[in-house]
């Protein structure tokens, strides 16, 4: 963390995501205080409870100053609303693929806006772009698992026949990505590629 801050200086916002891997509460405090010292923008899902305990994260917030981004692993409107009302986070993680689709995601975003809280959309995709374009209380579009040597998002493989993509090269010079404008989600899926990669199928009737 210190090496990254030294490399980029103050020209970039930095965040860290231990992915619920820190072994104890005190380890989470230690990393959180390092975030404080280095001016991190947020501190995400630190320790091994998988961000499931609102009371534990409320207590952790008392020990550090860096805003916490929690609730990637909690599903649904009611559970996430409880987490917010119990003081378990500073920023709420939401995801249209996991939180009741676009409708559930927008409900959570509006709820948080009403109580003065910001949200962060988890990962990327056409739904995420549409939601983000309609949410005022959010900051960043997440292209996860990319780096200069891995240019496409490992969570969002290239499965489109149009110019949509979630790779490093799809980010504009201004740091933004466009919102698809076609019918539905605005993208055209490459079903030949999707079917070629299929490993199993289940039909619900």
Q: Where in this protein do the model-derived segments appear?
A:
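Short loop or secondary-structure boundary microenvironments that flank
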Residues: 18, 47, 95-98, 183
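Metal-dependent enolase-superfamily TIM-barrel catalytic cores that perform enediolate-based chemistry
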Residues: 1-58
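Electropositive phosphate-/nucleotide-binding environments in soluble metabolic enzymes
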Residues: 25, 54, 102, 184-191
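C-terminal extensions of enzymes
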Residues: 158-205
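Shared catalytic-loop signature of beta/alpha-barrel
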Residues: 33, 39, 50-69, 74-176
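Structural signal for hydrophobic packing residues in well-ordered secondary-structure cores
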Residues: 5-8, 132-136, 198-201
């Amino acid at each position: 963390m210190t090496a990254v801050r030294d490399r980029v200086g103050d020209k970039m916002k930095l965040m860290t995501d231990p992915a619920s891997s820190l072994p104890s509460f005190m380890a989470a405090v230690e990393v959180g205080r390092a975030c404080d010292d280095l001016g991190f923008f947020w501190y995400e899902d630190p320790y091994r409870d998988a961000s499931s305990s609102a009371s534990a994260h409320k207590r952790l917030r008392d020990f550090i100053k860096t805003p916490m981004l929690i609730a990637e692993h909690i599903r649904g409107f009611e559970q996430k609303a409880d987490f917010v009302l119990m003081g378990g986070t500073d920023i709420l993680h939401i995801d249209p693929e996991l939180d009741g689709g676009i409708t559930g995601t927008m409900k959570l975003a509006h709820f948080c806006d009403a109580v003065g809280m910001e949200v962060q959309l988890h990962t990327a995709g056409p739904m995420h772009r549409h939601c983000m374009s309609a949410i005022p209380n959010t900051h960043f579009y997440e292209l996860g698992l990319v780096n200069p040597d891995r240019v496409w998002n490992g969570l969002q493989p290239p499965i489109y026949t149009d110019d949509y993509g979630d790779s490093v090269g799809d980010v504009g010079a201004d740091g933004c990505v466009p919102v698809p404008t076609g019918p539905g989600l605005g993208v055209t899926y490459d079903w030949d590629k999707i079917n070629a990669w299929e490993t199993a199928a289940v039909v619900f009737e």
